[in-house]
């Protein structure tokens, strides 16, 4: 890996794809709060948090390690590599690109320079691991042990039961979810053989939900016979805007959205943001400064290079991973394929034919049939439940950054179909009144943002406001455990949660506590860490000038306060 300052150059060039991906990087470990005693093994499968290594045992670079690129541990004082790296990207941009409208050299060098940072984490052009990368030996050994040895606990009376954290299914989260589903089936079979049980339960989160959905698609009979219940938390099966829109041309740089995202990160303890930064972003957003700064570059350059730059960034970072392609929404899929691989018959389509075959197979087998796959599983006897989280700003550069979300995916997607308002507007009074008149009042959230009646499984979908995508609280685990292990289909009327809609008080990182939940009411539902206001967009010119002046003076006060603060 090259010098740290070259890494910084790459970091700056990849910020659009990387920045918000750091959001789920600090999932808080929790201690189990016993809720009930399951008579079947419970399999846990999570997202992309598992550390991967190469053939020499070195940790593979992960976006969660992005902060480490600023450490100058290999800095020998020689700036030649810095200049070469920058020149390799800027020269073709300025000369062949801007002067002669030939952008191919720029795309090629952009992909090459950034790809060196992510080299060992990239899959090859067939979607297979390189450099001997994969799971750590100790994870493989642990899985081998638990799959072949009964992990049951016993009560003082000798009754056998299973807790929620003994059967972790570890996997290389970059790979094709359908291939991983084959491994999951084998894991289930071995557990059944070693325990003598006839069924298991499954708790899945984030990318793990794609693996489980693929398993249900490929092995429906096996699931019907051997899976009692499936519980999803923070699902990305229907797509995740931050991964889907980033490669389908849906960019909308929004300073106010960036500010809201920073306030969220500050509130949940990811990092501290100086209030002056927030005030500055407010000023940039409310005065229209950012829009004016970007107007000319956007007009002259953006539309000419967006597809080529998207392809270069995607294939040098995260999109040789079929697992991330599984998070592309059905609506964005065709556009994303063209942005990243070019039109049918293109050179890149041929070059990446093996990878594309896996991506398209998942699309044909899973993505295009998700409602049928899940309803089919339920009809075959598999119990199913969903937790959808919200109360946070999604990726600030997403075109749909106005949707209510868990930072990663919108509620409409993670809940499999809830009708929602936006961060700017609740569902209209007319809509809510009509739904109540039609008998759906119980499905409406007290904050006026969600109608759960349109979910794929409205009776077994729960909503938690104030818990982010990266937070897996004990309160969620209680419910997930019950959904997966219960001998009957659990519903919102008979679960351990006090309501279909709950509010979560986020854990203070400095306190040894996992927070609390309570039934949502009109009094406690205002949990957002910011106020979203788009009134300026529809204001007349005079109103905009007045607001800009007020914001400008507010920023000057904040600046002087910071400069002369004692």
Sequence positions of predicted segments:
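Alpha/beta-hydrolase fold catalytic core
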Residues: 164-178, 306-402
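Sec-dependent N-terminal signal peptides of Gram-positive bacterial secreted proteins and lipoproteins
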Residues: 6-27
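N-terminal non-catalytic accessory region
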Residues: 28-203, 210-265, 393, 405-406, ...
